[in-house]
Each structure stands twice: as C-alpha cells, then as structure tokens.
C-alpha cells in the first residue's frame, strides 16, 4: 500500500488526462484513477502501464483509507454528488471548475468541508500565475492610477461543452482573477448569451459587472479561430495590456490614460 499515492483521480477525459500526466510526473508512486467511460481509463493505463491502478468504481476510492485527497475532473452535473460523498468520507477535495453551477450546492459543499475540517478547492489556476500576481502588485502600488475599466477576453476554438455555457467554462477563470485582483464584491449588471451551435448552450457570452466604480467586461467564446487570453486595464495614469499568448511580450504598461 505504501507505493500508492495519497491522491486519487476521478474523471480521465480531456482535463483529467492532463492532471494524470502531472501526477505521474511529480511522484514515483502509483495513481488510482476511475472513469465511468472505461476507454478513458484504459488509454491512461496503456500509456503509463503499472504506474496506473484503475478502480472498479468511485466507492472503491472513497473507502480506501490510504487515499487522503481526491481530484474530480468530471462534469459539473455530477460534481455535487461526487464531491459531497468525498467530503463525507473525509477526503480533501480538488474540483475542476466550475465546481457546481448553483450557489446552493456550493454553499452546502463549503459547509461540509468546514464541518469535516477538509480542503475544498476549485481549479482556478490563474490565482497562481506569476503575471496575474504581478498585475495585482502594479494595481496595488497605484502605477495605473485609478482603475476605471477592465476588459478580459478568453477565446478559442473548442472544446465545446454539452452541459454548461461558455461563461461557466471560460469566464469563471476571469471572475476568479477579478476577485483575486481586488478582493471586493462584484455585481453583475448584464449577461449577453449567443447560442450558435445548440439551442440551450451559449457558445459566446459577455458578462458586464461592476467592482465598486470599476466597470468590467468578460468576453468568452469557444467559437474563435484563434486562441486569445487578454486582459486590458484602463487607469487614470496608465493602461495595462496582458496577452498570455504573446511569448515575446506578455505584459505591457502603456503611457496612455483615460
């Protein structure tokens, strides 16, 4: 049992396979995984051979006393039930975003994690991005002056989701960034949805919100021919441009103001 890692993975699709790759890289121990689609877990088993152990079901992972941490890389529709069971079994829990799609379920999971003194963490990786941290420092030091407007664009061609809109899939990252930068209450004033491919799923969305006197817009799309990850901040002294896809000059401060 000592050769089994304390972290198990449930869900080995697109993001789950990426997480599995990372787990394999950072440890020499075996990783327990489970996916209801056997072909997904079989692909990882074929790739990593004896480094992967495939559980028969989720309960096998929940009841395993060796497992202390569970990563959920599953659909939002099942995250609540799986997450609740993991916390009831007193496991620390990391959930790929969005954790859930309604406030009531999220509140219940938070309450349960606190009750059992366990970690509940969402997959908001930009909170650990060095450029985002630098932007926060620039704002805090007042280099931009009074921040007046922020526009964030997150676009690419796919992957197209079947259960959630693009603002849940992509825009949730940007909401977490804004929360990190200012740590203030955000008030959504408008949400525009464009359903292009399916009637009930929004492929392109625009969220308008206020953070105090700061006006913000978050544009999300998985129907864009190129991958874009951009943040523009307009201040009373200077402007800031962050282009994550620009390898040569990601972060610029411009001597322009409004």
Regions from the language model: what does each represent?
Residues 95-96, 120-122, 242:
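Hydrophobic residues in well-ordered beta-strands that form the structural core
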Residues 43-51, 108-115:
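Short, conserved SAM-binding/catalytic segment
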Residues 1-48:
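N-terminal Rossmann-like dinucleotide-binding module
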Residues 77, 100-158:
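A contiguous active-site-proximal alpha/beta segment in oxidoreductase catalytic domains
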Residues 28-29, 52, 89-91, 116-119, ...:
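A short helix->loop->beta-strand "cap" motif at the edges of active sites that frequently abuts
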Residues 172-252:
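Contiguous beta-strand/loop segments that form the cofactor/metal-binding neighborhood of enzyme cores
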Residues 123-130, 156-187, 203:
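Mid-domain beta-loop-alpha active-site segment that forms a flexible
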Residues 19, 53-112:
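Beta-loop-alpha module in the N-terminal Rossmann-like domain of NAD(P)-dependent dehydrogenases
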């Amino acid at each position: 049992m000592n050769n089994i890692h304390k972290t198990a993975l449930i869900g080995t699709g697109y993001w789950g396979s990426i997480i599995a790759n990372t787990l394999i890289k950072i440890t020499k121990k075996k990783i327990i995984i489970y996916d209801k689609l056997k072909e997904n877990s079989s692909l990882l088993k074929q790739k990593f051979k004896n480094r992967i152990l495939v559980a028969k079901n989720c309960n096998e992972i929940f009841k395993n006393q060796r497992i202390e941490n569970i990563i959920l890389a599953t659909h939002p529709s099942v995250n609540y039930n799986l997450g609740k069971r993991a916390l009831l079994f007193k496991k620390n829990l990391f959930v790929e975003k969005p954790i859930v799609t309604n406030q009531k379920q999220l509140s219940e999971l938070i309450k349960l994690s606190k009750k059992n003194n366990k970690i509940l963490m969402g997959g908001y990786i930009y909170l650990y991005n060095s450029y985002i941290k630098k932007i926060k420092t620039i704002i805090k030091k007042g280099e931009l002056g009074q921040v007046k407007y922020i526009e964030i664009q997150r676009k690419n061609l796919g992957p197209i989701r079947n259960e959630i809109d693009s603002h849940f899939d992509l825009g949730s990252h940007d909401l977490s960034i804004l929360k990190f930068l200012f740590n203030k209450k955000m008030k959504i004033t408008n949400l525009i949805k464009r359903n292009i491919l399916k009637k009930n799923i929004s492929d392109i969305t625009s969220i308008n919100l206020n953070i105090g006197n700061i006006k913000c817009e978050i544009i999300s799309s998985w129907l864009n021919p190129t991958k874009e990850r951009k943040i523009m901040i307009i201040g009373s002294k200077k402007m800031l441009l962050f282009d994550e896809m620009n390898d040569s000059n990601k972060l610029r401060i411009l001597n322009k103001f409004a």
